[in-house]
Design a protein with these regions (language model features):
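N-terminal nucleotide/polyanion-binding subdomain common to many enzyme families
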Residues: 12, 16-115
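A short helix->loop->beta-strand "cap" motif at the edges of active sites that frequently abuts
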Residues: 59, 129, 208-210
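Short, flexible loop segments at boundaries between secondary-structure elements
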Residues: 162-168, 210-246
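Proline-aspartate-enriched helix->loop->beta-strand connector
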Residues: 180-189, 193-194
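Short gly/pro/ser/thr-enriched loop/turn and capping motifs at secondary-structure boundaries
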Residues: 96-98, 196, 218-223
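Conserved beta-alpha
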Residues: 97-183
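A transmembrane-helix-recognition feature enriched in membrane-embedded lipid enzymes
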Residues: 97-100, 228-271
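A short, gly/pro- and small-residue-rich
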Residues: 77-85, 198-217
């Protein structure tokens, strides 16, 4: 971070100003929770929407939103603008879907990043969709690609890139964008972790020619590095507990503080 690191992200709002959306975002119903417009959708609706509009969505981005990103947005106006500045913010976290239902949106269903990846990969050969993977580590990406090619025969992987963990220089960034655009992907899956991946997508809105989707742990799930919770835990909103047991050191502090803030501000104060 620091001053020197602001290069790539400083242009977020300039980039967005130049980006001209080809679809009407108002057609996507939303429920504002802690200032973030959470899309009132379910998986079937989203898949149909993507299939119908994918060529009009080049250069836009989708945020995969959960309690953590929503609480961070509530406390950080810049990040809130990033969450609200894309095509939509989908309810990856069950608490968001439950809160929206309590607020009078019964049709909303949890739509997780890994599930979305899986469904899009399933439909890709029929549509001829091309995929680009940006982020994570070389090891994770190699494992993930091997597994995807095995599980989804015919899946077109147009390209992959593992950026360094430091901020890129403007020159490096321009090269990264050129590589993505040369590959002509329909979907650009971004695995930099929140909030970094959402800021990256906003900074590249209109510059990257593909639909960017920030999937964080999605790369880890597909590489097999992180196992997903059993289905019964997913159904009972206990996936967070399963992940906590796998990575207690990193996640305990985050879950404890953000979950409490969410319950207090969203559930009790109805922000």
């Amino acid at each position: 971070g620091g001053e020197a690191g602001k290069g790539v992200f400083a242009t977020a709002h300039e980039g967005a100003a130049q980006y001209c959306r080809k679809v009407d975002k108002r057609e996507i119903p939303v429920c504002p929770i802690l200032g973030v417009n959470i899309a009132v959708i379910n998986m079937n609706w989203l898949l149909k929407y993507l299939a119908q509009n994918i060529h009009q969505l080049q250069g836009d981005y989708i945020c995969v939103s959960n309690v953590h990103t929503t609480v961070v947005s509530y406390e950080d106006a810049d990040y809130r603008a990033v969450q609200n500045g894309g095509l939509m913010a989908i309810p990856d976290g069950n608490p968001l879907a439950q809160e929206a239902r309590r607020r009078g949106y019964p049709q909303i269903q949890r739509t997780t990043g890994p599930d979305l990846m899986m469904e899009v990969f399933r439909q890709s050969t029929a549509h001829g969709w091309r995929h680009y993977f940006y982020g994570s580590t070389q090891e994770v990406q190699e494992k993930m690609i091997a597994r995807l090619q095995q599980e989804y025969p015919g899946l077109v992987i147009a390209g992959t890139d593992v950026p360094p963990f430091r901020e890129l220089t403007p020159e490096e960034d321009a090269l990264a964008v050129a590589r993505i655009n040369q590959a002509q992907p329909d979907f650009v899956w971004v695995g930099l972790g929140a909030p970094k991946q959402e800021r990256w997508m906003a900074a590249h809105q209109g510059r990257v020619h593909g639909l960017m989707i920030g999937v964080g742990a999605g790369f880890d799930f597909f590489s097999g590095n992180v196992r997903r919770a059993p289905l019964w835990m997913q159904k009972h909103s206990l996936e967070w507990l399963y992940r906590l047991m796998q990575d207690p050191k990193r996640l305990f502090q985050r879950y404890w503080s953000t979950n409490l803030k969410f319950i207090w501000n969203a559930t009790i104060r109805r922000k």
